């Protein structure tokens, strides 16, 4: 069996683990509203914006993955999503609701779409003999992310505060996603995906 294809799968799972943290947004809404004085409903709008831009960017990102390769689109996803979380921290720090919507909603949402689409078709291409397993691996990280991110974020908020937590998570997402993106690539023409190391 190919060691390379499992490395690609791990990279894809890591990408999805990072962007899947979007589903832990509810952990942040209360603390953000409390710290800034914004209405809870105003804070939750950021999530809706992010999901909207996830869908919008995913719609056109698939073609870019095919044209430019998953390494580039994964890198773009890392830069956008990591920056979006960092901008979220800045938005809370300076108490700017529009910046929250732009940072988390637009920038982060675009990163979500790029990060979601990037590994799916790539992992499936490496596992032509196990398409069901490949699909499961491709989206597994996205599903597990909220379960992992929620407790980590709660502990960080309790330990170092809300804004530093956003900066720590944004930096971690950026670095982990950048690293993961570098191992993701399409199989080369004629490459035996079951035996290549």
Where are these regions (language model features)?
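Helix-loop-helix hairpin linking two adjacent transmembrane segments in secondary transporters
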Residues: 142-188
């Amino acid at each position: 069996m190919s060691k390379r294809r499992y490395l690609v799968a791990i990279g894809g799972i890591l990408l999805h683990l990072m962007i899947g943290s979007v589903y832990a947004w509810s952990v942040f809404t209360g603390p953000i509203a409390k710290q800034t004085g914004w209405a809870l409903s105003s804070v939750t709008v950021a999530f809706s914006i992010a999901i909207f831009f996830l869908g919008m960017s995913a719609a056109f990102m698939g073609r870019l993955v095919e044209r430019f390769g998953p390494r580039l689109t994964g890198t773009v996803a890392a830069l956008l999503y990591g920056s979006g979380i960092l901008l979220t921290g800045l938005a809370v720090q300076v108490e700017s609701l529009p910046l929250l919507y732009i940072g988390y909603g637009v920038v982060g949402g675009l990163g979500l779409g790029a990060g979601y689409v990037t590994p799916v078709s790539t992992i499936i291409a490496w596992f032509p003999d196990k398409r069901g397993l490949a699909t499961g691996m491709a989206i597994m990280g996205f599903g597990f992310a909220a379960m992992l991110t929620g407790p980590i974020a709660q502990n960080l908020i309790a330990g170092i505060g809300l804004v530093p937590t956003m900066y720590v998570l944004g930096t971690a997402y950026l670095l982990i996603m950048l690293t993961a993106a570098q191992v993701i690539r399409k199989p080369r023409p004629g490459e035996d995906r079951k035996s290549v190391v």
